Design a protein with these regions (language model features):
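Glycine-rich phosphate/diphosphate-binding loop of Rossmann-like nucleotide-binding domains
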Residues: 4-21, 25-27, 150-223, 235
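Buried hydrophobic positions in well-ordered alpha/beta secondary-structure cores of metabolic enzymes
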Residues: 9-12, 65, 131, 174, ...
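Generic secondary-structure signature for well-ordered alpha-helical cores
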Residues: 24, 28-32, 63-66, 95-102, ...
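N-terminal beta-loop-helix "entrance" segment that forms/cooperates
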Residues: 31-55, 227-229
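Glycine-rich phosphate/nucleotide-binding loop
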Residues: 43-46, 107, 229-329
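N-terminal glycine-rich phosphate/adenylate-binding segment common to multiple enzyme folds
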Residues: 47-157, 244-246
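Short acidic loop-to-helix transition motifs that present clustered carboxylates
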Residues: 111, 220-227
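Glycine-rich phosphate/pyrophosphate-binding loop and the adjoining helix
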Residues: 135-136, 141-181, 185-187, 191-193, ...
């Protein structure tokens, strides 16, 4: 199996290296082979090639069975032209691979409930999956930069556009995921204001009635969903949402977990999938060996499950992370008195060794 490695910027190299050690351990234990191809993306690609997404990176990603991404961006590239910012590399590879579905699981365990800004009894046991449409909507609609209109008034615009096929394919992902979980989908929109949301709600309801009657469907306005995530996160199973709402809600949900250093994500389409932690490149701690690699390791577990057809290995990797947490090992972002402080590479090694037991 071929994996395209895109460490990217900041802490990306450290966390990807730790995750690769764990993946190698899984391959050894479960009897499969991994071939790696490391490429550039983001700021490091700008420095080396002048663009955030070189053609060689696209070719490698398309030829791979899966892509593992670290993180992109940093203040070093804040003032480059908008069309070559590091984040353009991320958007570009999503488009090149046809990745239209972003999966973000969020769980709060007994080991992390005390980290949540919510009361532990409110947060512990939360287990939800955000299914976000990734390549449509306002981020990919027609844009006009600030300019003077015919009346001499400065204006700018961004178009929110969805088609029926785009809504149907992401909704199907959500319904299928719910069938394997607790059988409940919460579809999020702003149908009281937006025409695109009214179409979204209509299509999702039609699909539930026709193809998924066994799945419970609820519709929430996005503002109510944002509030309910804080008031009662345990009520949610699968949250289905468009691109911009999903971007915001998934970041909100991540704060409930108490640490973005624990949260993985998958971006899927009809071909090669891409896996990455939800946190950023954290350039302020890059190279210090203190970054938390667990979100990247858990992203690899998602890779094993969704792209490499290695469900047993995925379950074992997640269990190894839980075991290491239960043994009291923590990177500095999660460290507290009475626990065992370890570095990025040490955490990766601990999980790998636990997996090999």
């Amino acid at each position: 199996m071929k994996i395209c490695l895109l460490p990217g910027d900041g802490i990306g190299l450290e966390i990807v290296d730790a995750a690769v050690e764990v993946l190698d351990a899984a391959a050894k234990k479960f009897g499969f082979e991994i071939e790696y191809d490391k490429q550039l993306i983001g700021g490091c690609a700008i420095d080396a090639t002048g663009v955030p997404l070189p053609e060689a990176t696209i070719a490698s990603a398309k030829a791979a069975d899966a892509v593992l991404l670290g993180a992109v961006g940093g203040p070093k590239w804040d003032n480059v032209a908008p069309d070559i910012r590091p984040e353009k590399g991320l958007l570009g590879i999503r488009k090149a691979l046809g990745l239209y579905c972003n999966l973000r699981p969020m769980t709060v365990s007994k080991f992390t409930a005390h980290l949540s800004p919510l009361k532990a009894e409110r947060a512990e046991g939360a287990d939800l999956l955000i299914v976000r449409e990734l390549t449509g909507g306002i981020y990919f609609g027609e844009h006009t930069e600030a300019h003077l209109n015919a009346d001499g008034i400065e204006e700018a615009s961004d178009i929110e556009l969805y088609t029926r096929p785009e809504v149907e394919r992401i909704a199907r992902f959500a319904f299928e995921a719910a069938k394997k979980r607790r059988g409940k989908v919460t579809s999020v929109d702003k149908a009281n204001v937006l025409g695109s949301s009214r179409m979204w709600r209509k299509i999702v309801a039609e699909m539930q009635a026709k193809d998924y009657p066994e799945v419970e469907l609820n519709n929430f306005y996005v503002d109510n969903c944002a509030m309910q995530l804080v008031l009662n996160p345990k009520q949610f199973d699968v949250i289905l949402t468009n691109n911009i709402f999903g971007d915001i809600l998934s970041d909100e949900a991540s704060t409930i977990a108490g640490s973005i250093g624990l949260l993985p994500s998958a971006s899927l389409g009809d071909g090669t999938g891409m896996y990455e932690p939800i946190h950023g490149s954290a350039p302020d701690i890059a190279g210090q060996g203190i970054a938390n690699p667990l979100a990247t390791i858990l992203s690899v577990a998602m890779m094993l499950r969704y792209s490499l057809n290695q469900n047993e290995a995925a379950d074992a990797m997640e269990a190894a992370v839980d075991a290491v947490m239960e043994q009291g090992y923590r990177t500095p972002d999660l460290y507290a008195e009475g626990l065992k402080n370890v570095s990025t590479s040490e955490m990766g090694h601990l999980v790998a060794q636990e997996l090999l037991k």
